[in-house]
């Protein structure tokens, strides 16, 4: 067994989740993430599907890469968080995958041909 955090409604039932990225449409996280949060070494924030799509467009335009939608959640969170940090603050994130698996979603949501 394991102990972890999960999204719950006011009655303690597992909440429904939605995400533009199927890989992140899950109401819980790993026990490691819960442990790091308990230690004060991790904080979490949410981003909207629109913010994720905007981060996809920005990263694609600036780098020529087309990341999958999962890391675009991280990029969107960084875009929200960075203005509140000092200029010498270091932000690290990971970019994995590519958008090939997400092309149907991207084409529909970004109105691509």
Protein language model regions, located:
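Short acidic loop-to-helix transition motifs that present clustered carboxylates
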Residues: 52, 73-76
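Catalytic phosphate/nucleotide-handling subdomain of diverse soluble enzymes
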Residues: 77-113
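Histidine (H) residue identity feature
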Residues: 33-35, 73, 89
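General beta-strand structural signal in soluble alpha/beta enzymes
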Residues: 45-46, 67-71, 93
């Amino acid at each position: 067994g394991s102990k972890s955090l999960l999204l719950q409604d006011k009655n303690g039932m597992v909440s429904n989740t939605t995400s533009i990225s199927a890989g992140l449409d899950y109401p819980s996280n790993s026990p490691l993430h819960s442990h790091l949060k308990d230690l004060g070494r991790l904080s979490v924030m949410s981003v909207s599907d629109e913010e994720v799509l905007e981060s996809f467009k920005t990263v694609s335009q600036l780098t020529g890469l087309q990341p999958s939608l999962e890391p675009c959640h991280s990029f969107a969170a960084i875009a929200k968080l960075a203005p509140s940090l000092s200029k010498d603050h270091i932000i690290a994130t990971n970019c994995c995958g590519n958008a090939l698996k997400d092309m149907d979603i991207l084409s529909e949501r970004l109105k691509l041909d």
